[in-house]
C-alpha cells in the first residue's frame, strides 16, 4: 500500500497545526508521499514584496513575477521547512518539484474564454517509476506543486491536481509491475474542515460519501462550489484511473472525512 497525502497551505502556515499533522504523517507505516500547497503563504510573501495577487474564480493568475514568488515559497521555503521537520521525526524526506528528475511535465494553460492564467500548468505526463524508485530506496517524497514544460518553463500547478496525478501514476506503475490489486494506492486530501460539508459553517453537516450522481446534484444545488469543485474533480479522476480509495478530511483525522466513490 502506498499512501499519497495532500496537505493544504492553510494548515502549513499554522505552526501548531503543521506540527500535529506532520507527526500523524510520520507515524504512517509503509511507503508514503506528501504533496503540499502554500497559496496563502505565497500571497503573504507577495504582499511583503509589494506584488498584487490577482485571482479569477478563486484561482491564482501567475504572471512572471508571481511565478518567481510561488517557486520560492512552494519549492523553497515551505518545502524545505516540511522536509526538515519530517527529518527530525525519523522520516527520510526528500523535497522536490515536478522538474526534479523530470517526473511531472505540464503545458502552459491556453487562454480560454478570454482568460489568461499566465504561467499555470496543466499536467500531461507523469513518470511514476521515478517516484517508485525513491520509495523503494526508503525515501519519502515531499512534493511542491511546481511542474515544468518541454521548453523548460516552470509552471504553477494546482496542488490537488499534482496529488491526484501522483496517486494515478503510482497506481499505474504498480500495475505495470504485476500488482493487480487495483493499484493499491490511497489518496487523502487534508485541509481545515472535517470533510465536505452541506453547510460550510456547520462541522456536523459532514457528507460521508459522494458518488458521481450525488456530486452532480450537490453542484446543481450550490452546496459544492468554488475551490471544492477542482478538489472533488481530482478525487474522481484518481478513482476512475485505478486509485483504490480517496477521501477528503481534516488534517488531524486522516481516517475520517468524506469518502469519494465510483458509484
Predicted feature locations:
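C-terminal catalytic "cap/lid" subdomain
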Residues: 1-263
Amino acid at each position: 500500500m502506498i499512501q499519497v497525502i495532500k496537505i493544504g497551505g492553510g494548515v502549513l502556515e499554522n505552526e501548531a497545526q503543521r506540527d500535529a499533522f506532520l507527526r500523524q504523517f510520520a507515524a504512517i507505516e509503509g511507503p508514503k508521499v506528501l504533496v503540499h500547497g502554500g497559496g496563502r503563504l505565497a500571497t503573504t510573501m507577495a504582499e511583503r514584496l509589494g506584488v498584487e495577487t490577482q485571482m479569477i474564480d478563486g484561482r491564482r493568475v501567475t504572471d512572471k513575477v508571481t511565478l518567481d514568488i510561488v517557486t520560492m515559497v512552494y519549492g523553497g521555503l515551505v518545502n524545505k521547512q516540511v522536509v526538515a521537520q519530517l527529518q527530525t521525526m525519523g522520516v527520510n524526506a526528500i523535497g522536490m518539484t515536478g522538474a526534479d528528475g523530470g517526473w511531472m511535465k505540464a503545458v502552459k494553460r491556453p487562454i480560454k474564454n478570454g482568460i489568461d492564467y499566465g504561467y499555470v500548468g496543466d499536467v500531461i505526463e507523469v513518470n511514476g517509476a521515478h517516484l517508485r524508485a525513491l520509495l523503494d530506496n526508503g525515501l519519502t517524497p515531499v512534493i511542491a506543486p511546481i511542474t515544468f514544460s518541454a521548453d523548460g518553463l516552470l509552471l504553477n500547478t494546482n496542488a490537488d491536481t499534482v496529488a491526484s496525478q501522483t496517486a494515478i501514476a503510482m497506481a499505474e506503475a504498480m500495475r505495470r509491475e504485476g500488482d493487480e490489486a487495483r493499484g493499491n494506492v490511497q489518496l487523502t486530501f487534508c485541509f481545515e474542515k472535517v470533510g465536505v460539508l452541506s453547510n460550510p459553517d456547520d462541522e456536523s453537516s459532514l457528507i460521508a460519501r459522494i458518488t458521481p450522481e450525488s456530486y452532480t446534484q450537490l453542484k446543481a444545488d450550490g452546496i459544492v462550489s468554488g475551490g471544492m469543485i477542482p478538489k472533488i474533480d481530482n478525487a474522481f479522476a484518481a478513482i476512475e484511473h485505478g486509485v483504490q480509495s480517496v477521501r477528503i478530511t481534516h488534517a488531524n483525522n486522516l481516517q475520517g472525512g468524506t469518502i469519494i466513490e465510483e458509484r
